Amino acid sequence: MKSVTLIILLLNSALGFSQAAEFNFLSKTTVKWDKTPEGEQLQHYFVFENSGDAPLQIQEAKVACTCTKVSFPKKPIPPNEKDSILVSFDTNNKFYWQDRTVELIANTKRKGKLKLKVYVIPKDEME
């Protein structure tokens, strides 16, 4: 019984000292554009810092639509270093309010989430 208790205590201590990377976005994670003409290509840079104590490695950026493209650093981001993620949205064939979410898969405890909101004015409604 003593050996089982010792093993549990050692495992708990090891987990408590584990290193982790963490996203710390330095600006809002939701960007909103009002009254954008259909056909515009929108872009926004999301600046972040790795506030963890291990290098941050982004493996994937999940999007629900091919109209949204994401460019992220492929190299690990050291602790306390800054970098950015570029999100582009193509408004062609998109109308009225559009909401897009980017889910960032990385070696962090929580997934990063970025949001784009845009009101697209259809070509046939523009003056």
Label the predicted regions.
Residues 95-124:
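Terminal connector regions
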Residues 53-84:
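Surface-exposed binding patches on compact interaction domains or structured appendages
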Residues 48-52:
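Asparagine-centered strand-capping/turn motif at beta-strand->loop junctions
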Residues 4-14:
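Sec-dependent N-terminal signal peptides
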Residues 85-93:
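Short, hydrophobic beta-strand segments
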Residues 38-45, 92-101:
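Short, solvent-exposed loop/turn segments enriched in Ser/Thr/Gly
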Residues 19-45, 120-127:
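Beta-sheet-dominated interaction scaffolds and their linkers
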